[in-house]
Structures are given as C-alpha cells and as structure tokens.
Amino acid sequence: SEEDGGLNFGSVETMIVAEEFGKGLVVEPYIQTVVTCGGFLRRGNSVQKESYIPGIISGDDIWAFAYAEPQGRYNLNDLSTTATLDGENYIINGYKSVVSGGPWANKFIVSVRTSGEQRDSDGVSLLIVNKDTDGLSVRDYPTVDGSRASEITFENVQVSKDNLIGEEGKGSELIELVVDETIAAICSEAIGAMKVLNDATVEYCKTRKQFGQPIGKFQVLQHRMVDMFMQYEQSVSMTYMVNLKLNENNAERRKAA
C-alpha cells in the first residue's frame, strides 16, 4: 500500500509486471520476495511492516517462503516442522526441502506447526527467521528451470515470539491466500514467456525456407502454429481470470487458482 511506501498496486498490476518478466526470462527472485513474502508481511502487524517492508522496497533484503516438506506434496498443512514457545522465543525444529529463491535470501518466512496433528488445518503458524540464525543450515541446489532452491534444516533455532505473523495456529488461511496470489503471478510470468516463444516460432516459419518457399506455407506447420496460438490464448484467458478472481471470496478464488 502507499502507507507502507508502495504504489498501491493490486493483482492486475502484478500480472502486468510478471508477464514482462516472463518475456525477458528474468530469473531474479522478485515473485518470492515481493509477491509471496511481501504478501505475508503486508498482512502482518504495524511493527513488522515498518521493520521489514522498507528493506524489500530498497532491495537490501531478499526473502523466501520455506513451506515445502518431502511428505507434504500439495498439502500446505502437512507439516512436521514444529515451533514450541519457550518463554519469549519459539524453538524451531524440522526440515524444508524446496525453498525457491533460498540461495539468495537473507530472510525466510517459515510455516511451522505450533499445535495439533501433522495434517490439521488448525495449528499452523508463520515465523520470520533470519538466515544467519544459529541452528539454521542451508544446502543450495540448481532447479530444472535454471533457477536455484535450498534445503533448510532447523535444529533448535530460536526466534522471538514477535516474529510471529498473525495469530498463532491460524496461519493456514493466510498461506492459502498468498499461495493463490503467487500462483497467479507465476502464471502471468509463464504467459510472457509463451508469447515470446510463439512469436519466435511464427517468425522462424516465415523466414526459414525449404524447397524454395518459407516453411510456414506448409499446411502441417500452419496447423501446428494455430494450435500453439490457441493454447497461448487459452492460457492468457485463464491467467486473466485467476488474477481478476483474487479479490473474490475464498471459494471463488480457490476455484480459479
């Protein structure tokens, strides 16, 4: 928001920016820092917003969301990483397997279980953790898309209870909301890349000659180019719908995402 030093952009403006990033194959962790972790922080308390959002705006801080665990797959509530309140601090123990943007991040937002059973929707909390905190170890690795991710191990990592985002044990709904916003941004990035690839393919078919004529005159390739164009346009339409539905009620938003 403008109160936090931003431009008061919404999902549509984020879509436009992400689509342009896709066209340029920008691999910097913008979505992880600004859309995902920024999405959590702007819903935090005033002290958290004042403490952390300026660092994102200035570019001094890079953030990553540590949520994925080997057994969790697509269940965001399936968490074996725990945080136990001990006086003024939470003690975190556990493991996160795929932390996108982790190699560049100096701060993490970590989903942890503070109560309940491993797959319960209640009992999920969000904590801010600095990368240099004692007991936190990171192993970086490349991903198939040319980016990088991290594995993170927490061994009795202590963080202040002031680092809790929102209410303890009630983080599940906020995680679903921000993940939906992230999905919409990633889809926007994807259609930007698809646009460039489709245009490059059409141009190649116009200029590459075989048997004395451009290969774009061959009917089989024309059919393939039409199929590519239709798939691209369908992807654009779906992405627009997802972004327009982000401000709807939970059921409509989840259905679109």
Residue ranges of model-derived segments:
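Internal helix-loop-helix
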Residues: E2-E50, P54-D60, S100-K107, L246-N249
